Amino acid sequence: MLTANTIIIDVRTPAEFAEGHVEGSINLDLESGQFEAELPNLDPAQPYIVYCRSGRRSGVAVEIMKASGFTQITDYQTLENAANKTGLPIIE
């Protein structure tokens, strides 16, 4: 669920992110190691929405976050699903 405190994370590559992303999302590429490198800088008490292209990478990211003590995580799987469920536009 989207609140004023929700952080939206796009775990796709920077090239994919540049092609289109949910407004206000941050890009933390799972495959390059950027996601795991930045994880200690994220607040586990905040709510998060995670998405990618197909749901595979976002699912992996959510499992990593859960193992690191994050509890308020929603996996919206795809860019389109994240945009629809949050009501936010896709920025290209």
PLM regions and their residue ranges:
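Rhodanese-like catalytic fold shared by cysteine-dependent sulfurtransferases
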Residues: 2-7, 14-46, 56-92
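Short, surface-exposed ligand- or partner-binding patches at beta-edge/loop junctions that are enriched
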Residues: 51
